[in-house]
Amino acid sequence: MLIKHNIVALLAFSFMASATAAEFSIGAGAVYNESPYRGYNDNVHAVPLVSYESESFYFRQTTLGYILSKSESNEFSITASYMPLEFDPGDNDDHAMKKLDKRDATAMAGAAWYHHERWGSVKVSAAADVLDNSNGWVGEVSLFRPMPMGKLTLTPSIGVLYYDENFNEYYYGISGNESRRSGLSSYSPGDSWT
């Protein structure tokens, strides 16, 4: 498979509303995605941005969390999230890629730790595929800093993502059977950092 770099640009405009010690925000964004799969068209999607924060639960992007421990500077939670990565050979324009197996989106479960300081926040998380599509897991270490600007909040971040070998094999590998059907070379990726 020809693997391209994912480019995601997110422009978010949100507002905050408070209700009994919980915070809810809603907004709209745009996501540009250059597909990692050859034969897919680049696309832009409008996406709703919904966030909910309470003392015990949160919903951030595609992740639901239950907070086990929280202090002024630390938060530890268990998480469940949606991993939207998928491949549908029927939607592909490339003849060889149409002969590969379908890869499904999945659900992930894991844990996250946030450490908050005045200069920003650090996130460390890990999650595993609970639907056994890939039997893989992913990890993240990132630094972010919300920057309120009136009713708009911009949150720049930088980080490192880890994908284990099973995750990469499922989403990006080409098995021997797929190679024979498609004429593409078999491919077995290892783990990766991005």
Report residues per predicted region:
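Cleavable N-terminal export/targeting peptides
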Residues: M1-S25, G39
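Outer-envelope beta-barrel architecture signal
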Residues: A22-I26, V44-A46, E55-F57, E72-F76, ...
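Membrane-embedded beta-strand positions of outer-membrane beta-barrel proteins
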Residues: I26-A28, V50, Q61, F76-A80, ...
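Residues on the lipid-exposed face of transmembrane beta-strands in outer-membrane beta-barrel proteins
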Residues: A28-Y32, P48-S54, Y66-L68, A111-H115, ...
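Transmembrane beta-strands of outer-membrane beta-barrel pores
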Residues: A30-P36, S54-S56, A80-E86, E117-W119, ...
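Extracellular loop and loop/strand-boundary signature of outer-membrane beta-barrel proteins
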Residues: E34-P36, H95-K99, A126-V130, R181-G190
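Solvent-exposed loop/turn segments connecting transmembrane beta-strands
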Residues: P36-D42, K70, R103-A105, A127-V138
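Outer-membrane beta-barrel transmembrane domain signature
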Residues: V130-T194
